[in-house]
């Protein structure tokens, strides 16, 4: 399994970790209804090969303690990094770790 779904205070969250990263990403996801007025990502319902929309932009500290940023689409369990990534992963494909 590449992702885990859990509920916290009535909202559903999906958590996953990219290969090479030391921290999980946890995002609110829509499991019922549509994205209209929802502050959450749409999700394809698959824990093995999750797809989320819209894109994901995450700021984090690298191993040197410098703030950096990754920006990607999550498609079928693979992180498709966009060209504006500032962490050296621009235009790369990164799989998700097993949970």
Where are these regions (language model features)?
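A short Gly-Trp-Pro
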Residues: 1-15, 23-99
């Amino acid at each position: 399994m590449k992702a885990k779904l859990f509920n916290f205070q009535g909202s559903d969250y999906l958590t996953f970790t990219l290969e090479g990263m030391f921290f999980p990403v946890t995002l609110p996801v829509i499991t019922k209804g549509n994205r209209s007025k929802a502050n959450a990502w749409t999700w394809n319902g698959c824990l093995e090969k999750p797809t989320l929309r819209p894109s994901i932009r995450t700021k984090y500290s690298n191993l040197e303690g410098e703030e950096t940023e990754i920006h990607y689409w999550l498609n079928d369990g693979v992180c498709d990094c966009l060209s504006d990534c500032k962490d050296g992963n621009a235009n790369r494909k990164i799989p998700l770790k097993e949970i």
